[in-house]
Amino acid sequence: MTDPRDNLLDSHLVGEGGSNVEPASDPTLYGHVTLDGQTEGIEARSYQTFRLTYTVGRYGLDDTGAIRIAFRAMSDFGRLQMADPTAAGYTTATASNGCRLALTYEPRGHNRPRFKSLTIAVGGGYLREGDTITVVFGDTSKGSPGMAMPTFIDPAFEFKVYADVVATGHFTPVPGTPAVEVRPGPPVVWHAVLSSLRRPGETFLFGVKAEDKWGNPTELAEANLAFETTLPVNGLPSNFAYEKGNRSHAFEGLSVDEEGVLRITVRNADTGEALAESHPMVIRKGAVSGYWGDMHGQSGESIGVTTARHYFDFARNKSFLDATSHQANDFQINNAFWAYLQELAAEYNEPGRFCVLPGYEWSGNTGVGGDRNVFFREEGRQIHRSSHALLTDRSDINTDAPDANILFEKLKDEDVCIYAHVGGRYADINFAHDPKLETAMEIHSAWGTFEWLLTDGFPLGHRSGLVCNSDGHKGRPGASYPGAATFGAYGGLTCFITDELNRDGLFDCLRKRHHYGTTGTRMHLDVRARFNGDTALFDKDPNAWDDAQSAPADSIMMGDIAKVSGDTATVSVEAITQAPIERIEVRNGMDVIHTLRGFDKPDLGARFRVIWSGAEYRGRGRQSEWRGRARFGGSTIKRMSKINAWNLERRLEVSSADTIAFDAMTTGNFGGFDVWLDEDPDGMIEIATNHGTLKVRAGDVGMEDTALDAGGLERRIRIFRLPEDNTCRELSRQVDVPLKPEGDNQLWVCVTTEDGFQAWSSPMFVFRG
């Protein structure tokens, strides 16, 4: 039996504040709504036409009154417009009695969570009971292709109707929200998913799925699959019939007996075609394994889409995560939804298989500390909200924590871990930070990449780990594509290095900072250091804890805090990746001390990589638009490969024999392309953008960046050369890093792979004494 709490339509779980005033006590008197058009099985990002009819109720609809159809804020359906009848999104409306109607579409025209709205105002008359207003979304009568649907699946894409029947400017919901079902399109890519580190004999799962072109797992795929493995895998069949109707399949309870690197190639058993290759998984004896989580996202009960149950199911069964948490904005979490989240966390938490941490997002404005993620070890704890902004129940308002320092004070005796993050309201860690509670900085999400959130803490003496998550709003934790609207990046993941997959293991890992983050890929990353003198390894931060203890150590790992007598660290880095490694930066604080590559200058070919990156500023409007062209004078482009071009509707293409045209967006992350030229060129390269032009002779471009700073927040254009075919997917190096005599040395690495993904290790905090 379906739980009614899993249906978002007009749900009492949705944090959606309204007014306590309205024309009558019975909302059915304001009219009713019907929707005609295809309502089921609509393909994501297809063009559709819908006819919505509002029938006026007993109160009539006054002159200058209006109706409003509102949509979810994070839905990326195509923009509605009334100006061009031949273009997408053309929308019309007519009144049955001939009244004049004025249509206005606004991206922020209504209240959260339904910012996007179409308002239809009556002029030159009024409507009586029984009169109608008919709205055609995607009116194709004059050549429009229709209304572009969202890029992601949505079991209930809502047309929420409100009416201002007495022309007060106050809109009241009309009962009976129409909705349509958006489903995945046909498959275009297969994925094979493994974890990254297991011990011999330890069980793991292997996930297989097919996605449509927008990243939705699709049930339209079918194939006879064959698996090729680099190590013998206990429990994995050699062949598998993947049938239609399934959006994924997980092979559980697998194990490998011998040490090595496991990669699994998925082939079409009938044709031999390679469909996918898995992430690498290292099988190694030791005390720990690597478990992957996306701990930050939300669903339609707050600002996202789909339901909380769908969210947890996707994390476990579609993106094959080991761990997750639901992080709704606190000012939208009513008490019924908070209680339901506790139930779901307990239901889905399965030690050893899938770890769920109960939690929420404390969503204070930046001026009072900015966004924080709160994770509890157990269910049933008190939520301390930043405000009750969208909550009508005020009975527990005295439990609020209106700034981040108050939040830390209220949670000081709780068993919690806290992240700071950058979303709509970026965290100000100078305003508030508690090193006992706030263990990590989230430096990548679907909002972009934000190394500065971590590095801001270096001069303040903070010793925080780093994490990456999706902060996804589209119901796809662990595989969160940005779509075609607000978000600019693929969602991140965190690898927790710990001895057991359960809440205790994750909390221990977070408090030791033994984790690393990626921009969405899975790779094995091991970072350690040893020193030319005595080393004292602390069990916790001695600057925060009076009872911190230290013990002699031969070496330390990512996240550790140590006092050393020597002046040099020998940092060892091991990276084993899915795609070839472009570079690894070894850093001390904000300085890059070494750049490691698996190739050298003689290996370079006529392959150039062009990268644009950065943001406008730190806040919500951080999107940087990149429009322009790159011309490779005197050469012919043999082929071009896109990098992080997530929005399929933005231009990135070969526009002539020697030119690439682009229209892109970054939000602190990077995008770009590789180009292979017909010969080793020596002509002039010109990359002209709306933020500046970079000119350089091709012969002067090497494997180091040639860059142009372009204002904004770390905004720049770069070009460098790569080998024609870089095959380095495993890189192990040791390098010496001089230690500063005073203060912390924050030793960490950043790995960049050729497919556009990055990974960062939590810093090792080393001081001399």
Question: Would you name each region that the model predicts?
Answer:
Residues 42, 48-51, 91-92, 114, ...:
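Core sequence-specific DNA-binding domains of diverse transcription factors
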Residues 1-189:
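Ser/Thr/Pro/Gly-rich, low-complexity intrinsically disordered stalk/linker tracts of secreted
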Residues 291-294, 322-327, 355-359, 373-375, ...:
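Structural recognition of the beta-strand scaffold that forms the well-ordered cores
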Residues 260, 339-346, 392-436, 451-463:
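Histidine/acidic residue-rich metal-binding segments in metalloenzymes
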Residues 52-58, 137, 206-210, 570-577:
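Aromatic/hydrophobic beta-strand junction motif of beta-rich domains
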Residues 40-47, 60-61, 196-202, 558-566:
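Short, solvent-exposed loop/linker segments at the N-terminal edge
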Residues 193-197, 213, 217, 224, ...:
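C-terminal functional module detector
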Residues 259-262, 275-276, 280-409, 756-765:
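A metal-dependent hydrolase metal-coordination microenvironment
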